[in-house]
Regions:
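C-terminal helix-rich "cap/oligomerization" subdomain common to oxidoreductases
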Residues: 63-66, 101, 112, 216, ...
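NAD(P)-dinucleotide binding in Rossmann-like oxidoreductases
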Residues: 201-202, 216-285, 303
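N-terminal Rossmann-like dinucleotide-binding module
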Residues: 1-45
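Rossmann-like dinucleotide-binding domain that binds NAD(P)(H)
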Residues: 156-220, 225-231, 305
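Hydrophobic residues in well-ordered beta-strands that form the structural core
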Residues: 51, 89, 114-116, 145, ...
Length: 343
């Protein structure tokens, strides 16, 4: 199987290294608008760098992995669909709902599989919590508490194109909550704040946010995120039912010293520094699964339509943050012309 990879930045280089070790991948070719960067990565990994995207597809690909800049995702997905090549694309599908809708409709029409990179679906802890919930072991679900905390903030230049904290960061929680529960978010109430560097406010964004979500079965969830958690990268989820609970991410590398004098909690290693370190195994698994998708052996485990559903929740949270009012997710769907769209 020959795989192409477009975008050789940090996550692209990581995925390229991973793909070299995935069973069944016999060829890898990389491309980037920064041809020197692509050539350097190709030289490091002992693979080929294509001079451009057209030349990459001319080689004949069995699948393509898109890790380019967010603003290019939708265009690159459409190009892959034009070529009839199965696609893996890092989130988001597009910077906005309209662009995402366009990809959803096109992917459905042409039938070429597209997998979106919500890697938490492949994390062992989230999968175990989902299994415990759906087995009935936890009883009926009443509360979910999710947090995503970056150890250090991104560079100032990233903020204007990031989409904002809800769309860039919390969208992972919105996706995993829908996937884990099998339920839809019907309304949100969200707030945001800036306590750190001024470039967040200058970019019309926040560095810390919180949202209250209500699901269609009246389960409640809180989702918080911050760009400032110097103790370490911290991603957790509490799944609380009438008969039991599970916590994802509470391991011996969680940056959570106990305040209880009677408890001695010793870390086995330093806290996670980045999301790539925290979710290393999940990133590997999702690409292994993508090769199965590209081969036609399994359906896409995360379609553009599912990514759109998570984006609707993020859009509702952003609207709520700006207005200070609760927002029904249906209002966002309808306003986007997406009343019948999504998963």
């Amino acid at each position: 199987m020959k795989i192409g990879l477009i975008g050789t930045g940090r996550i692209g280089a990581f995925h390229a290294q991973t793909l070299r070790g995935v069973p069944g991948v016999t060829g890898l070719v990389v491309a980037d608008v920064d041809t020197a960067r692509a050539a350097a990565l190709a030289d490091t990994l002992g693979v080929r760098a294509a001079p451009g995207i057209a030349e990459m597809y001319a080689d004949g690909l069995d699948g393509v992995v898109i890790t380019a800049a967010t603003s290019a995702h939708a265009t690159l997905i459409h190009q892959a669909l034009d070529a009839g090549v199965p696609v893996f694309c890092e989130k988001p599908v597009a910077p906005d709902v309209a662009g995402t809708l366009g990809v959803v409709e096109r992917a459905r029409a042409c039938g070429v599989p597209v997998q979106i990179g919500f890697q938490r679906r492949f994390d062992a802890g989230y999968r175990a919590a989902r299994e415990a919930l759906h087995s009935g072991e936890l009883g009926w679900l009443h509360t979910l508490r999710a947090c995503t905390s970056d150890r250090t903030p991104p560079p100032a230049g990233y903020i204007p194109t990031s989409g904002g904290l809800f769309r860039d960061c919390s969208i992972h929680d919105f996706d995993i909550l829908r996937w884990l529960t099998g339920r839809e978010v019907v309304s949100v109430y969200a707030q945001g704040a800036n306590r750190g560097a001024s470039f967040f406010a200058d970019g019309d964004d926040v560095d810390t946010c919180a949202a209250l979500l209500r699901f269609d079965d009246d389960t409640l969830a809180t989702v918080t995120a911050t760009r400032y958690n110097g103790a370490g990268h911290d991603v957790r989820l509490e799944v609380c039912g009438s008969e039991g609970a599970r916590v994802v991410g509470l391991d011996d590398r969680a940056p959570l010293p106990s305040a209880e004098a009677r408890l001695s909690w010793r870390r086995a290693a330093a806290p996670y520094a980045t999301f790539m370190e925290r979710f290393h195994d999940a990133y590997v698994t999702e690409l292994e699964v993508f090769t199965e998708v590209a081969a036609g052996r399994v359906p896409s485990p995360c379609s553009p339509a599912e990514a759109l559903d998570a984006l609707y929740v993020a859009e509702a949270c952003e609207r709520s943050r700006r207005t200070g009012l609760p927002v029904a997710v249906a209002e966002v769907r309808t306003g986007a012309g997406g009343a019948a769209q999504g998963g």
